[in-house]
Every structure is written in structure tokens, then in C-alpha cells.
UniProtKB/Swiss-Prot annotation:
A motif ('HIGH' region) lies at residues 52-60. It comes from Mesorhizobium japonicum (strain LMG 29417 / CECT 9101 / MAFF 303099). GO terms for biological process: lysyl-tRNA aminoacylation. Belongs to the class-I aminoacyl-tRNA synthetase family. It catalyses: tRNA(Lys) + L-lysine + ATP = L-lysyl-tRNA(Lys) + AMP + diphosphate. Keywords: Aminoacyl-tRNA synthetase, ATP-binding, Cytoplasm, Ligase, Nucleotide-binding, Protein biosynthesis. InterPro entries: aa-tRNA-synth_I_codon-bd_sub2, aa-tRNA-synth_I_CS, aa_tRNA-synth_I_cd-bd_sf, Lys-tRNA-ligase, Rossmann-like_a/b/a_fold. It is an enzyme of class 6 (ligase). This is Lysine--tRNA ligase.
Amino acid sequence: MAGSNTIDLNPELLAAAAESKAWPFEEAKKIIERYKGGEFPETILFETGYGPSGLPHIGTFGEVARTSMVRHAFRVLTQDKVATKLLCFSDDMDGMRKIPDNVPDRAALEPHLHKPLSSVPNPFGGDYASFADHNNAMLCRFLDTFGFDYEFASATQYYKSGRFDAMLLRAAERYDKIMAVMLPTLGPERQATYSPFLPISPKSGRVLYVPMKHVDAKAGTITFDDEGTETTLSITGGRVKLQWKPDFGMRWAALGVDFEMFGKDHQTNAVVYDRICNILGGRAPEHFVYELFLDENGQKISKSKGNGLTIDEWLTYAPTESLGLYMYQRPRQAKKLYFDVIPRAVDEYYTFLGAYPRQDWKERLGNPVWHMHDGNPPAIDMPVPFSLLLNLVSASNAQNKDVLWGFISRHTQGVTPKTHPELDQLVGHAIRYFDDFVRPTKTFRAADEVEREALEALDAALGALPADAGGEAIQNASLNVARKIERYQDHSKQSPEGGPGVSGAFFQMIYQVLIGQERGPRFGSFAALYGVAETRALIQQALAGQLA
């Protein structure tokens, strides 16, 4: 999905970027403001987090895609004079709190509960040493597939290599200050046992949630009870990790993170992360809080519930770019992430792409495709919308691409799978989407007397048109039929002749009776693509009671 690494810095673009209100520019301007009056650091660090207790999912894609858009906007605003890096950080030292549902041989993982994910055996087979190693590899493969420019980081490696040692020692020195931030956020029971330090048990290898008996900042050790045995442990070298809220702030301070976005579920904790970062001598990064996705019933999507849409499912029915567009649009608005949003996202993507060459720079920088493709959107001609392909599959009962291409090639001269490979890909997506989501819900209904008369009149009107009539001619003929029928007259609209306009109920009736669906694209466009003769045959089938 990512575009070229070369950035266009022409003067018109730069002037438009300085004024742009597109959200990636708004976020990038915050980072620039952060260093106003001073020098930028050697590298501006963008970070995203990953919890390897599960495989990478659609939220992972969204976070990396959106952060990449902000990073690109920053590069443009600074004329690419400041180095940037996107760090994808895996929290693979977290304890395995529960066994995921989607792993083979769950019982074999029971003895490893609460061990760091990087110490849990890999249940998937292959060459990966641990559960986290496998999922981290899946993350990198996932990000590489989409062409993201990033650097992977492992919490286990950072802790064990000593990258966090200085901050851990500072956390011991400032233990009381950290506790003063954390305790008010906890209930009375948790307050009594809470510690920001989580030792890895030398006995069991588990991540221990135990109270501290003593924190020795000078020696850099903590003392606690491990299954009844008083134990003193060095806090450096990966023997101890921090609880997740202090860990967030510590990481920001240790690495000098400049920008991190997270879901709304983190919003109340952001102030805690910031304060911990400040206590440890760091400067909290700029935040961007995005809204969470909802399922078809408006419920929050949960990995454990599996009530959302996986990235593989989306990409079964639509190109990657449609998902990129969905991530760009309205990130601060709760949106439904379910199968029925896919067709619109596909058509909107190609509409934005088609508009791009005609736009000036101000409009281009407000066009999602500029952000999705790092300022270099491809030139793709998409002569048939996805929604129209779906109706064509529905009317023709096509089971393979060849049938659909028969209609497309007849309607649009010179368009073939070779000349338009993106359309060919979309044809395959449309067949799969129709088979899985439209066909099972298709319900034809019989026409009543008024509707039968309307369909007979429509059949006659189509019969008066040439066999190769275009969409506009068919649409006008259809409207002329509807204007003469009282049920379909809309007196709030006006026809070109000054009479009443046409109610949307007319075209809804056509789709319900002929296609078995509640709605569809512009009827004239559909009939032109399907064919005048074929559309008339469909009307005759409906009138003969062969559909309902």
C-alpha cells in the first residue's frame, strides 16, 4: 500500500501542505510545534505497539498505516530534512495471562501460563523458538506484505540486552513518585499489593504480581516473596519488567518517542503514561487517540470474542487499498467494521483515485489516496464500480470471471483482463463477496398489479431502445415510465417537463422484484452493462413468476 520513498517537494505542494487541514498534517504539525524554537533531534521517532498474545489483526494494520501517514506528512512539512523512524514494538515479555482460543493443543500450554510470551513454547510448529517469536515473525511478514517502512523491536531483547537498565535503575530511585501516581488509580485491594516492578521468578519462570518487601535503589535490587521464599533480584538484565502502565511511560522516556497513537480504551491512562515518562526524565510524546471499531451490532470489537472482521477476511473480498481508505477516513469516529462496509469502501477508493489527476494541490492533500500512497497514487482506470459488478453477478448468477467479462467486454470496448488487471481482480472479489454475503440473503418478491403494469411498461420502453443503448438513455426511459404512474410520482421533485419527479420507491421495486435485493446502483448503468435484451428477459421471468 505504501508508495515510493521519494518525496515530491514542489513549491505548490509545500504551500498547500502548510495550510492543509487533513488530519495527518494536523498531527505532524504538533510534532513540529514540539521542537519550536529549538533543534530537532537526530531522528524523530514514531512508535506503534503490538501485543503478541494474538496474531496481527486489522487494528495492527490500522495503527501502522495511520502512523505512516503522519510520518509522511511530517517529512513533507520538514522538506525531508529530518530523519524519521517508525518503531513497531512488541510487548513480548508480558506474561501469558490466558491461553488463546486459536492455538493447537491448548493443554500443552497450561504449564506455561504467566510466563513471558517469549518463554512460552511455540505451539504452531516450524522454526520459531517461542510463542512470541512465531507471532513476531507473523507481524513482520504482515507489515512487509503491505510495504510498510518500519523497524521491529522486541521488549524481551530490549530488557535482556540492557537497553532499559538505566531507566529501571531510575525507576527504583523514583519508586515513591511512581507509586504516588499509580496508587490513586487502583482500588483498595490492589493498592495493598501493587508494585510497578514485576520480577520473573527464578523458580518458575513466571511473571510475578507480588508486593515489594524492599526496593534498594543503590544496589539496583528488589526483595519479594516467591512462593514463600524471600528473594532478592537485580532489576537489570531482563530479570524484572515493569507493569504495563509504567512500562509505557518508561519506554517513551528510554527511547525518546515523539509520536504514538492508541485506541480510545487507553485514553484515561494516557495521563498516567505521561506522568511516569516525566518522572523518569523523559518528555511524553504527542498522542493521537483513535476511536475503536464496532461490530455489526454496534458492540466493541474484541480479539477474544472474535466478533469483528479479520484482515484476511477483508482482503478476500476487496483490495488492500479499500482497507487503507477505511483506516484514513474519520479515525476519531466510531465506525462499524463489518462485511457490509466493504463495497462502499472499494467504490470510494476508486472514485478518489479517479479524481486525483484533476485536482489542484489543496484538493490533492485532502484526498485520502495522496496519504495512502505516500504522495504517489497510481493511475488506475476503473470503468465498472464494485457495486455494479455485484448486481451483475446477482442478475447473471455468474460463477466465474469469464461470464462477467463477457458482459463487461461487450459494454466497454477495449477493456479486457489484460488491459485492466485491477478490474479483473475486482471481478474475482465481487464473485466471492456475492456468494458469501449477497446470495444467502437474496429474497425475491412477486410484483403487485401496479408493479406488474410498471414492469410491462418498462419492458416496452426498453424494447424501443437500440440493443447497445447507453446507461443514460436507459435511465431516462425508465424515469419516463415511472412519471406516468401515480404511485411513483414524487411531487417534491420536478421533471424536466415541469411535472412531478420520480420516487426512489420505483427503483427499489425493480431491485426487489428483479434482483432480490433491497437496493442497487443506478439502474440505467446496470441495465446497460447487463444488456437491454437480458434485462427484458429478466422482467419477463419476474412477470411469469419464475423468480419469486
